[in-house]
Amino acid sequence: MLTLENVSKTYKGGKKAVNNVNLKIAKGEFICFIGPSGCGKTTTMKMINRLIEPSAGKIFIDGENIMDQDPVELRRKIGYVIQQIGLFPHMTIQQNISLVPKLLKWPEQQRKERARELLKLVDMGPEYVDRYPHELSGGQQQRIGVLRALAAEPPLILMDEPFGALDPITRDSLQEEFKKLQKTLHKTIVFVTHDMDEAIKLADRIVILKAGEIVQVGTPDDILRNPADEFVEEFIGKERLIQSSSPDVERVDQIMNTQPVTITADKTLSEAIQLMRQERVDSLLVVNDERVLQGYVDVEIIDQCRKKANLVSEVLHEDIYTVLGGTLLRDTVRKILKRGVKYVPVVDEDRRLIGIVTRASLVDIVYDSLWGEEKQLAALS
């Protein structure tokens, strides 16, 4: 699908931003470029759509050299998403999404249908089509930025740190949505990030760059288990290598508790406290009759609100980290250890609760990792 052959970029004065990059990307593959500031990751990506012209080498998309194409026409065939989103404030959401199809002279009705179809993919209804960007939250605006890149059905999408400016919960939610979207649409994606956790979570393969050169290319598991050198090991961070000592435990389903303590939103706060006391827990997951996760309540929330509220529905918090069933365990480890989360609910694609991973669930894995390391050191000494 996409091939880079001996691609380099040299600026005036002889500074080499990218040096002799060679890479083949298959159709439908999700590739993350990552590395320290100034490593050439964004420059490499921008050479693909000729926002930056290569100084040397060749880039082929579906066997066609990009230098043989008109740069404007080339860019219209490639989706592009940036951190700043770049929505036009004077255009409606539908007009923003339909920008490239309009340039490609799609009929108006087809553009409208495409906008509604895409909004549905990210659970945004037709009521959004006539709104303006300032009426949307930051997360919703970034969703529209992604949909705009998908609107003309390009086979290739370039994404330059698209979620970098969002708060952690919104960022996490968008990553989950985008991962699900990619499974449905099978686009070829080149994604630039400075966040190793994001790369590990999203990518089929990760390309690590340093000083304009590729240091290592591999799947997240390959790189976690076999870092190419000390630079890669330090860049990954040892806290991300916890799972490598427990290769038999890979997915949340293997360690989650399938019977988390739950309550429905119509119950009283007194009933919630009684249930917590009975089950010896300090928080409850709130679900509806179909076990769709609504949010959570805990002792602290109830204590703060008990004088002015009576029902769980009045005090439940909806912002909660979740992972899909089948998610790689490393993503959940990251949420619990790095973000200080006490637990992570596991849901299906319809957000029905199927389990929970707690800090206690991870004790054996962390213990095996640390104990295995100590035994290795003892054997070497």
Swiss-Prot record:
Changing residue 341 to I: In strain: 168 / LH45. SUPFAM superfamilies: CBS-domain pair, P-loop containing nucleoside triphosphate hydrolases. ATP binds at residues 35-42. This is Choline transport ATP-binding protein OpuBA. Keywords: Amino-acid transport, ATP-binding, CBS domain, Nucleotide-binding, Repeat, Transport. It comes from Bacillus subtilis (strain 168). CDD domains: ABC_OpuCA_Osmoprotection (cd03295), CBS_pair_ABC_OpuCA_assoc (cd04583). One of its GO terms (biological process) is amino acid transport. Transmembrane segments: none annotated. InterPro entries: AAA+_ATPase (IPR003593), ABC_transporter-like_ATP-bd (IPR003439), ABC_transporter-like_CS (IPR017871), CBS_dom (IPR000644), CBS_dom_sf (IPR046342), Gly-betaine_transp_ATP-bd (IPR005892), P-loop_NTPase (IPR027417). Signal peptide: none annotated. Residues 2-236 form the ABC transporter domain. One of its GO terms (cellular component) is membrane. It holds the Pfam family ABC_tran. Involved in a high affinity multicomponent binding-protein-dependent transport system for choline. Probably responsible for energy coupling to the transport system. GO terms for molecular function: ATP binding; ATP hydrolysis activity. LH45 is not a natural strain. It has been constructed by transformation of strain 168 with linear DNA from B.subtilis ATCC 6633. It is a subtilin-producing mutant of B.subtilis 168. SMART domains: AAA, CBS.
